[in-house]
Amino acid sequence: MSMQDELQPLLSAVQRNCHISDARYAGNYSLCVYLLKMREYFRWEKGYAFRDNLPDGDVGDWLKERELFWQTIEDEPFAELPVAGDHYDPFDSDAVNAALARYGLVYSGGLGSKGTPHFFLGKLGHREQRSDFTLLVSENEYARDLTAPPAMALGGNIFIRRESLRRMIWEKIEEWRWHRLENAMGRALRVFDLENNAEAALEEMTDTLIDSVLLHEKGEVLAGERLGPDWERMLGRVPGTKAEIMVRAVRDHLADSLTTLPGLLAAAKDASMHFYFASLGNMQKHLFPALVQAYDSWVASGDPGAIEQLAPRSEAHWQALAGRMLELYRHDPDDLAERLVALVESSRFE
């Protein structure tokens, strides 16, 4: 039996779990974002290059078929993963990766934003043991879900998905091209020769962003150590609420204050800084208007002083706010969402 034949049941099981997750959670996107992501999912599944024009009729037919298929599997449980005669829990990434080591593959199964399960199986491009975590970088992806987050910290592992990062960048480019606004994304794209050599530019952007993504995920690991297990328990109390979005944004800001902002300032690469601000979510910007103002100051003057002054202050702010949020949860974990929203809203960093 060839390795491809041996691993086909695993590939099918991982992709099935991806489909089940999509069936349950794809509807959480706005219509515009959903359609954009589905077009790029079609591109990946059918093997089209980024610059290829997609056949709209085929995309439409595929979309209808996929949504009908989702209806048939939405209530299925996630499948166990078969590897070398054994079966593994799809969320036990450590055990699955130990079994996959001899095949040169990497797997991840975990929960992302809004408790959405994410799974992927890909070619292991790089594995590195650091002092406080293991870095696993995947190349080609053989199974993935609609969202395909480009990075995730799970336990003592940081997974970076190079192909998903490239696709995320491409989605951002396509989205920006609709309006061509003079914003952080537009400034980041101007650094690269996108119009004349899109593939080379995309590779260069991916190399640039991998360092930034790793900085954030390292910050996530450190933030998790500081916040402890009660943070995830608190998050589990407020699923699908504004409070959940705020809890995630506060942790993101804490992680970035620990590693991302200091690392970006030390690297002094304009493209990396622009990409970072282009990737900030609406809630992150709402909670940290001082950071947006510092970025605007840097853009106008070329002097990063405002960001440099803000970085150490932000760590103290988000650490203290996170502590107060945990106190609320520990004092009374019931009816938590409204109290968290009120606390965080009153603690914006302006």
Task: Label the predicted regions.
Residues 248-264:
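An active-site-proximal "capping" alpha-helix that borders the catalytic cofactor pocket
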Residues 97-147, 155-156, 164-169, 173, ...:
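Basic, amphipathic N-terminal segments that precede the first structured/catalytic domain
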Residues 208-225:
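Active-site recognition of the HExxH zinc-binding catalytic motif
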Residues 1-125, 197, 350:
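N-terminal low-structure segments adjacent to metalloprotease catalytic domains
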Residues 86, 200-212, 241-249:
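Short, charged/polar micro-motifs that form catalytic or ligand-binding hotspots
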Residues 129, 139-207:
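Active-site scaffold of zinc-dependent metalloenzymes
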Residues 221-252:
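Post-HEXXH active-site segment of zinc metalloproteases
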Residues 55-58, 64, 260-350:
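Long, well-structured alpha-helical subdomains associated
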